[in-house]
Each structure stands twice: as C-alpha cells, then as structure tokens.
C-alpha cells in the first residue's frame, strides 16, 4: 500500500473546489492521478487546480442538477484525457437543522436534487463511459454517518444520504458485470464548507463533534475522508463493492447498538 496508488488514472471529483473534494484532488494527484475538479464554485475550483498544477488538475464548471451539464463534464474529461477510471461523487448540500414540523419542502427538493439526483446523473454517465471503453472503474460516493442512523443531521440531508446509500448498493448490483465497483465513504461531522464558514465556526463544529464522538483523541479532518476515498478508488480495494466505509470512529456502530 505504498507508492503511486492511482498512477495513470483519470479521476472526476465533484464538489472538488473545497473541503473533502479539494483534499481528495490534492491526495489523488499526489498518487499519480490526473483530476478533473467539477464544481459550481468557479474561482475556488480554478484556484485548487492551479495550486495542484495544471498538468495534473483541471477545473470544469458544472451544475450537477442539470443532466446535460453532467454529461458534458464526462465528455470533457474523456476528450481531454482519453478515458475515465474513477468517479468520486462528493458534491453535496445541507440545510440548517430544524423541526420536521417546519420542514421546508423547497429546501428538501434542492437537497435531494444535488445529493441524490446529481450523484445518480454522474454515476450514469461515468459508468456509460467506463462500459464503452471496457474500463474496470471505481465509483465512490460521499455518503454520511446519517446514511446509517437518524438523528445527527438535518431531516432533508439525512433522507438524501439514506437514498444515496441505496443508490450505491443498487448501482453496485447493476455495474458489477462490467467490472465496475461502487462504494460509499461515510464520514462523521467534518468542518468543511457544508458546516463551517469561518475559523470560529470550524472550531465550534470540531469541538461539538469531538465532544459527541466515540473515538477520542482525534479530530476528524477532510484529509481522513480523502484517505478513505483513495483506498476505495484504488486497486487496494479491488474486490470491495457495495460497501459504505465508515470514517466515523465507530459512531454509527455504537449508536446503533446503544439504541
């Protein structure tokens, strides 16, 4: 498990302009991949690509709720690099916490459109490309601890991550015959753009998550999630598919047991 674990691989990372996606872009290119960063945040995405090096990373602006834009992002990648080996479907949104009695259904629809429909569109078009080229690819989706249990996250976000995990498992069944693996990576609370807006809120999120965590002495960072995604993207996990790899310090297991 040393050396260039993605040497020569072509990777799309959605939500790659910040947080877990940006960490994954840096890590994957360190391991020999060429990465296309897909995001709506154009300035941030371009800056990440430039910081990595434009010989290894490029940016493509895409609204993942628009299937035509998703298809074009995959086409751009294949035209630029000749193939697609890995999709890290990481883009997501999260609404504020609130009572189910006051559920904002417009916000619910937006969350589902990004977190589920957008992921489904990318899985569809990435898999089509892999099948057409005979690539035994890997698809990794950022799910969440909230895909396993209710309670920690907002209602719409929790529902979307449960749905996404179902999609991962269903796609695993449909794509296995082509040699394509599909897995989820499920973090506990991480201080990223979804949860934090400045240094003060980063500390608040990390303090809260550390206080409620099962595993003490470690603060979960975006890099830890990127490490898990690297494992699932690489041939180190060559016979792993349909799994939801928890990066939660045992939170989901212990909470399920205690409940």
UniProtKB/Swiss-Prot annotation:
One of its GO terms (molecular function) is oxidoreductase activity. NAD(+) binds at residues 12-36. The active site is at residue 157. Substrate binds at residue 144. InterPro entries: NAD(P)-bd_dom_sf, SDR_fam. It comes from the Eukaryota. Its EC number is 1.1.1.-. The keyword Oxidoreductase applies. Keywords: Oxidoreductase. Disulfide bonds: none annotated. It is an enzyme of class 1 (oxidoreductase). Belongs to the short-chain dehydrogenases/reductases (SDR) family. This is Short-chain dehydrogenase reductase 5. The lineage of its organism: Eukaryota, Viridiplantae, Streptophyta, Embryophyta, Tracheophyta. The gene is SDR5.
């Amino acid at each position: 498990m040393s050396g260039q674990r993605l040497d020569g691989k072509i990777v799309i990372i959605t939500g790659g302009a910040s947080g877990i996606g940006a960490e994954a872009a840096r890590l994957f290119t360190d391991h020999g991949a060429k990465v296309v960063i897909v995001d709506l945040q154009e300035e941030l995405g371009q800056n990440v690509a430039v910081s990595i090096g434009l010989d290894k990373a490029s940016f493509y602006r895409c609204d993942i709720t628009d299937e035509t834009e998703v298809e074009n992002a995959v086409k751009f990648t294949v035209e630029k690099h000749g193939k697609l080996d890995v999709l890290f479907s990481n883009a997501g949104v999260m609404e504020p916490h609130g009572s189910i009695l006051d559920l904002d259904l417009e916000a619910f629809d937006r969350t589902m459109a990004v977190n589920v429909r957008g992921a489904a569109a990318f899985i569809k078009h990435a898999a089509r490309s892999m099948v057409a080229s005979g690539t035994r690819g890997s698809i990794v989706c950022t799910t969440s601890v909230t895909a396993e249990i209710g309670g920690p996250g907002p209602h719409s976000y929790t529902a979307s991550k449960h749905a996404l995990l179902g999609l991962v498992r269903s796609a695993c069944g449909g794509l296995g015959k082509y040699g394509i693996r599909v897995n989820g990576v499920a973090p506990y609370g991480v201080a990223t753009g979804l949860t934090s807006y400045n240094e003060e809120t980063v500390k608040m999120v990390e303090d809260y998550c550390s206080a409620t965590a099962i595993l003490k002495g470690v603060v979960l960072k975006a890099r830890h999630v990127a490490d898990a995604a690297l494992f699932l993207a690489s041939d180190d996990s060559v016979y792993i598919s349909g799994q939801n790899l928890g990066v939660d310090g045992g939170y989901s297991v212990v909470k399920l047991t205690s409940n």
